[in-house]
UniProtKB/Swiss-Prot annotation:
Protein name: Secreted mono- and diacylglycerol lipase 3
Gene: FGL3
Keyword Heme included in the entry's annotation: no
Sections of the chain in a coiled coil: none
pH dependence of this protein's activity: Optimum pH is 7.0.
Keywords: Disulfide bond, Glycoprotein, Hydrolase, Lipid degradation, Lipid metabolism, Metal-binding, Secreted, Signal
Enzyme type, top EC level: hydrolase
GO cellular component terms attached to this protein's record: extracellular region
Signal sequence bounds: 1-29
Amino acid sequence: MMFADDLVRMAVLRFITVALAAITNVANAVPTDATKRQDSNLPFPLAHFTNTVASVQNTYCGPTANTPGVKFGDQTLLHAIGDGDTVQRTNIYHSESLGIIVASQGTNLSSIVSQSHNIQAIPIIPDARLGLPFGSMVFAGWQNAWSKGWTDVSAALADTIKQFPNDQIIVTGHSQGAAISLLTALAIQNQFGNVSTIREIIAYGPPRVGTPAFADAFDTIFPGKYTGVVNGDDWVPSLPSQPIYRHPSGMVWINPANSTSWKYYPGQENPDGPDSRVIQMFYPGTLQFNWGDHQGIYMHSSMGTTQGPCPAQVGGF
């Protein structure tokens, strides 16, 4: 009887040993890429930033780099909307790791039309397609830039959602494109909210887009899904001025510029974040704009209307 009990115990012990070995092998097979780990100083995984910086950078490149089928990293360009001149370029990508990415181009410094959006500074009633509540107001130039492309963007996005129905959407942009990205996110939520989900909105070097009522409404619609990113002493996110305009909640500050020293500041206009800087729009003793930190290295990828690589490159900086 004791011999039989010993056999049972040995069999159980053998089963447990084999099971533990199998579990260990599975655990060891899990990728340990550092970019996929959550950085406690960022609201989203680092890889989401590194990849979407490249998504945006490619919108600054010429027509050849913005032909559907172009690939970089694990992203494939599906749709390129707008000519980057009279209509700000918006690209729609599919990423194997992140899903659908919608990225908007910043100001084209060689385009009078593109630059004109930056000075249409009157707050106006938002377009009904944004789905904002009464009392919200938005910067006229950003809404004008968004509106010119939205019909074509929404049609292309509808096709993309049909092609990848289980994928979520990340919306992103830089500078003027960052402002457009907030409006694009609202329009996507309003038009496609019943068939798709916005995962994140990441706005690089974002100017303020709307009034405090706009910022509050945006926070309500996208709780915990948004962050702006400010590089060093970039002054663009400090405009247009408060109290008429206000950022939604959440801002990452890369400080010093182009470094791996960054921190997330929750809430609207956190006084410990980029709002604590004294901005310098011009080079000392001149009226020449200092665009320095507006372009540069964001989370290991390079981006800027004149400085970034073409075609875009994911990481490596």
